[in-house]
């Protein structure tokens, strides 16, 4: 089967790789000059299945109001007056109940755990290198309330059989020795030893090279204008003056998927803006050894070989990718507070990206009402964590195979009752 994958971020490239491995003839199209040059470029570097949690959680609406008046708040909202933004936020609020949180987190952990297994198998088969580490994730708490609040997440972890360790302040240094110097600031931590880290851009670039060896064709610097219909199927994708034809099409365009699919399949994927800095390590003893998640600031601090990546924030501001200096200050404050002297933040690079977020936090992977159109988008802050599993699952679905995990609640069909749009795009073949 000839398949066109639209998008060459980590989700698009993993989709292409697993489809090619399943025997399909795959072409990847992207407007950028190479793979992983947008959202996958400088993310937090975490592969954290156990921390796969929706932003829509009990208590978040009240916290959001408080965060509006805090300088270093993890969430910021700027209303733009669009119906889509307001509808998306309303849908997110509806998912902030305890029952919805449990359902959403459960399926996110299911996909993320499977994805880590797929990544480990891929690494064993190919030997792919991406400055990866397998030291686990450590979530640190600064208040007793945060420490006690971990109970609801632990319940989900137990149900999913995810190993965990609840640590006292004195025990934190067992996982991250440099935290011994600041243990007096912390009330404890939750460690997930099965989590991993790695440079997502490096992984995506090298996997694209492996995919090329399997016959995948990459077309960069190519405009992706519209899908062309022929009857009730997709005939091709309009790229400038050219119509690229195939048997099936995969939309993996991240935050741009919603607009691209407008008039065909209406999906609630909104751009959630995040930031990161990447600093060189200057003192090995004061640097992290794996990845640390600061519960107060919702910031991840991740160790690469000779760099520290610090990423976080969530801004509901549309497609604005401007770099706000106040956000850099928060990232620097967090890493310098927990790992003082570990990295030189004065020499750090500063980046922002748009994570494709659904209201329930779960990505949209699988079939659509259009027979030969498939989606792999909406992974939010967990595109790196869920990429391999999503790619393998999609390849199985498109190949007519039974996926290794429950997948019916991951497709767009869970939203069709409330967000289904028209059946035809603007362009027809």
Curated annotation (Swiss-Prot):
Pathway: Amino-acid degradation; D-alanine degradation; NH(3) and pyruvate from D-alanine: step 1/1. Transmembrane segments: none annotated. Coiled coil: none annotated. It catalyses: a D-alpha-amino acid + A + H2O = a 2-oxocarboxylate + AH2 + NH4(+). One of its GO terms (molecular function) is D-amino-acid dehydrogenase activity. InterPro entries: DadA, FAD-dep_OxRdtase, FAD/NAD-bd_sf. FAD binds at residues 3-17. GO terms for cellular component: cytoplasm; plasma membrane. Its cofactor is FAD. It comes from the Bacteria. Keywords: FAD, Flavoprotein, Oxidoreductase. One of its GO terms (biological process) is D-alanine catabolic process. Its EC number is 1.4.99.-. Oxidative deamination of D-amino acids. Belongs to the DadA oxidoreductase family. This is D-amino acid dehydrogenase. The gene is dadA.
